[in-house]
Amino acid sequence: PLAVVVDITHHIAPQDLIQTAYIIESSHMYFPKGTIHIVVVDPGVGSERAIIALERMGHFFLAPDNGVLTLLFEAGEIGSIVRVDNPNYFLDSISQTFHGRDIFAPVGAYLSKGIELKMLGTPVDQKDLICLSIQKPFISEERELVGLIVWIDRFGNLITNIDYNSLDKFCTLDREGTPR
């Protein structure tokens, strides 16, 4: 009853893992250390896909192993990672369609009570987890900055993956495409 629940969004396009990855990567740092981030964008619910829990820079993440944490992996500084497979921390009855309720929420509650990650399941190496192939911003042969539209918000704004460093690099090119 003392937990604060912050619902970041319900506006992710259905099953859009890339959009989810960007929202997680761009929002988690605004929460205090110790925050438990539960990610339930899960096209594989009810299948044999794994659920993982990890620690990164004092934050905990609980998500399906479907690539939604790709950008966190790329950012580095990942601590412990476990495959959440200890049923002692799940509800007794697990449905095929509500793992958010039956697994993610109870495991998140146990994390909030201080249970160690290692108690939740089997250690796993980051290289064994699913990562999405997400195009990185680049400068084309035509000297154009090319990025990916990650999502279009409800106001029609295009949110891209073009970051400050990519834009800065592009803006420092002369007309011939060489750095100034």
Describe each region flagged by the PLM:
Residues 2-4, 11, 15-22, 26, ...:
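Active-site histidine-anchored catalytic micro-motif
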